[in-house]
C-alpha cells in the first residue's frame, strides 16, 4: 500500500496515457461515418473474364470494389491506373476501397490471364 501512495502520480499518468491511446485507436479504427455514401461495385471473375468488364461510376464517389473469383484457379486483380494489386483465391471475394476518382477511364486486368481478364472502370463527369 505504501508503494501505491509513493507512486500515485505515476500510476495516474500511466492510466491517462492508456486512456489516450485507447481513444486514438478507436478514432483510427472506429466506424467510418462515410460508409453511407460508399458505392459498392461487384465484379465477378468467370472463365478468366471480368463480368461485367466495363463499370461506370460517378465522379467524387467513394467506391468499394467487390471482386469475386468464381473460377477454380487463382487470379490477381490488378490495375496500374488505380495502383492496386490483390490476389483473389478460387471461389473467394476481396474488397478494394477506392477514394473518389477523377473522371476518366481506368484499366483493370487479371494478371494471370491478361489475354482474357480485361476491363475498365469509367468515371463519369
Swiss-Prot record:
Keyword list, A-Z: Membrane, Transmembrane, Transmembrane helix
Cell compartment(s), UniProt: Membrane
Transmembrane segments: 10-26
A GO term from the CC aspect: membrane
Membrane topology, from the record: Single-pass membrane protein
SUPFAM superfamilies for the chain: Cupredoxins (SSF49503)
Main localization, broad class: membrane
Highest taxon listed in the record's lineage: Bacteria
Signal peptide annotation: none
InterPro entries named in the record: Cupredoxin (IPR008972), EfeO_Cupredoxin (IPR028096)
Protein name: Uncharacterized protein RP394
Biological source species: Rickettsia prowazekii (strain Madrid E)
Amino acid at each position: 500500500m505504501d508503494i501505491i501512495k509513493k507512486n500515485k502520480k505515476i500510476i495516474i499518468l500511466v492510466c491517462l496515457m492508456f486512456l489516450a491511446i485507447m481513444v486514438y485507436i478507436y478514432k483510427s479504427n472506429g466506424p467510418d461515418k462515410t460508409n453511407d455514401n460508399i458505392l459498392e461495385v461487384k465484379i465477378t471473375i468467370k472463365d478468366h473474364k471480368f463480368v461485367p468488364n466495363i463499370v461506370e461510376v460517378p465522379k467524387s464517389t467513394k467506391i468499394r470494389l467487390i471482386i469475386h473469383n468464381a473460377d477454380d484457379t487463382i487470379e490477381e486483380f490488378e490495375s496500374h491506373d488505380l495502383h492496386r494489386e490483390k490476389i483473389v483465391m478460387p471461389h473467394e471475394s476481396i474488397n478494394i476501397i477506392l477514394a473518389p476518382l477523377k473522371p476518366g477511364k481506368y484499366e483493370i486486368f487479371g494478371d494471370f490471364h491478361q489475354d482474357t481478364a480485361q476491363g475498365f472502370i469509367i468515371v463519369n463527369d
